[in-house]
């Protein structure tokens, strides 16, 4: 390939020692491209009508040439998107990438937009779980004092979830990915303003190499791994991430035994239902994401990354275990012992963010004592 076409990448100096954990940004970009492409082809054949939506999905998978490929790539691609973004955030927490405040805050905004987009998309097939998940989650708006009921009616476009709701959810699901593209551009521009951090958390200005070919090949390897996994799941277990309830058409008269959102929202849903109060649960749900914004302002350690901070490492891996446990608990019915497990893990989840500054001070003291 001619050298001049790669000039843009060659002009981008990147830290020599960034590891595989730094590859997930480019993988997220690939996921976004895949979702917009497959989503466009699905939108060509989808009908946003409560009587026809479910049938149009069946039509896409059965009658449209390669429609099943597009539909499966889109639904499994969403799961891949969230796997990558959660790893991307975990890396940011571990290596304290959040100290680059603008990049971190734009990233959290991106996460919130992505979650909204995925939620709207989950409603579109108009299956049982789509309908009831939409009913339960949008109903949380009624917990807002004074404005709640008006806001919910405004969002629904009526007094219940019906045709206007599906139409506006489709419109929002179509437009929000372009907002994500814009925010991604902002995120990348802000990142290259200062440059990536690295596993040591040190200034790497004196030790940088061109992005291409060194890091671009490393990115390509992980990208190949992700695409292979995506196609393996699509070929051998296409319904791996789907809920069996969603294979039945939405019926407002029959409530599923256990209403739950897609797996990537289960941690937030688990926190929501662990609080036996509607407003309290809604606030906890919002805070489960919003609390990430506090990280740049509560960092007290003199050492940037957790590579050299064993106490923080312990808390970090506790957070990961907590995240997985909440996700698992949220798949279970609301009965003992799952209620208690959900409440304990929710407390543990928030305690990571609250004890982080205290741990930083403790580690600083320990380092001062040893020097």
From Swiss-Prot:
<keyword id="KW-0812">Transmembrane</keyword>
<dbReference type="GO" id="GO:0005743">
    <property type="term" value="C:mitochondrial inner membrane"/>
</dbReference>
<feature type="transmembrane region" description="Helical">
    <location>
        <begin position="104"/>
        <end position="124"/>
    </location>
</feature>
<feature type="transmembrane region" description="Helical">
    <location>
        <begin position="68"/>
        <end position="89"/>
    </location>
</feature>
<keyword id="KW-0813">Transport</keyword>
<feature type="transmembrane region" description="Helical">
    <location>
        <begin position="24"/>
        <end position="44"/>
    </location>
</feature>
<keyword id="KW-1133">Transmembrane helix</keyword>
<dbReference type="InterPro" id="IPR048260">
    <property type="entry name" value="Cytochrome_b_C_euk/bac"/>
</dbReference>
<dbReference type="InterPro" id="IPR016174">
    <property type="entry name" value="Di-haem_cyt_TM"/>
</dbReference>
<dbReference type="GO" id="GO:0008121">
    <property type="term" value="F:ubiquinol-cytochrome-c reductase activity"/>
</dbReference>
<dbReference type="InterPro" id="IPR005797">
    <property type="entry name" value="Cyt_b/b6_N"/>
</dbReference>
<keyword id="KW-0408">Iron</keyword>
<keyword id="KW-0479">Metal-binding</keyword>
<dbReference type="Pfam" id="PF00032">
    <property type="entry name" value="Cytochrom_B_C"/>
</dbReference>
<feature type="binding site">
    <location>
        <position position="192"/>
    </location>
    <ligand>
        <name>a ubiquinone</name>
    </ligand>
</feature>
<feature type="transmembrane region" description="Helical">
    <location>
        <begin position="169"/>
        <end position="189"/>
    </location>
</feature>
<feature type="binding site" description="axial binding residue">
    <location>
        <position position="173"/>
    </location>
    <ligand>
        <name>heme b b562</name>
    </ligand>
</feature>
<feature type="binding site" description="axial binding residue">
    <location>
        <position position="88"/>
    </location>
    <ligand>
        <name>heme b b566</name>
    </ligand>
</feature>
<keyword id="KW-0999">Mitochondrion inner membrane</keyword>
<comment type="similarity">
    <text>Belongs to the cytochrome b family.</text>
</comment>
<keyword id="KW-0349">Heme</keyword>
<protein>
    <recommendedName>
        <fullName>Cytochrome b</fullName>
    </recommendedName>
</protein>
<comment type="function">
    <text>Component of the ubiquinol-cytochrome c reductase complex (complex III or cytochrome b-c1 complex) that is part of the mitochondrial respiratory chain. The b-c1 complex mediates electron transfer from ubiquinol to cytochrome c. Contributes to the generation of a proton gradient across the mitochondrial membrane that is then used for ATP synthesis.</text>
</comment>
<keyword id="KW-0472">Membrane</keyword>
<feature type="transmembrane region" description="Helical">
    <location>
        <begin position="311"/>
        <end position="331"/>
    </location>
</feature>
<dbReference type="GO" id="GO:0006122">
    <property type="term" value="P:mitochondrial electron transport, ubiquinol to cytochrome c"/>
</dbReference>
<feature type="transmembrane region" description="Helical">
    <location>
        <begin position="279"/>
        <end position="299"/>
    </location>
</feature>
<feature type="binding site" description="axial binding residue">
    <location>
        <position position="187"/>
    </location>
    <ligand>
        <name>heme b b566</name>
    </ligand>
</feature>
<feature type="transmembrane region" description="Helical">
    <location>
        <begin position="338"/>
        <end position="357"/>
    </location>
</feature>
<dbReference type="Pfam" id="PF00033">
    <property type="entry name" value="Cytochrome_B"/>
</dbReference>
<keyword id="KW-0830">Ubiquinone</keyword>
<dbReference type="InterPro" id="IPR030689">
    <property type="entry name" value="Cytochrome_b"/>
</dbReference>
<comment type="subunit">
    <text>The cytochrome bc1 complex contains 3 respiratory subunits (MT-CYB, CYC1 and UQCRFS1), 2 core proteins (UQCRC1 and UQCRC2) and probably 6 low-molecular weight proteins.</text>
</comment>
<keyword id="KW-0249">Electron transport</keyword>
<dbReference type="GO" id="GO:0046872">
    <property type="term" value="F:metal ion binding"/>
</dbReference>
<dbReference type="InterPro" id="IPR036150">
    <property type="entry name" value="Cyt_b/b6_C_sf"/>
</dbReference>
<dbReference type="InterPro" id="IPR005798">
    <property type="entry name" value="Cyt_b/b6_C"/>
</dbReference>
<dbReference type="InterPro" id="IPR027387">
    <property type="entry name" value="Cytb/b6-like_sf"/>
</dbReference>
<keyword id="KW-0679">Respiratory chain</keyword>
<feature type="transmembrane region" description="Helical">
    <location>
        <begin position="217"/>
        <end position="237"/>
    </location>
</feature>
<keyword id="KW-0496">Mitochondrion</keyword>
<dbReference type="InterPro" id="IPR048259">
    <property type="entry name" value="Cytochrome_b_N_euk/bac"/>
</dbReference>
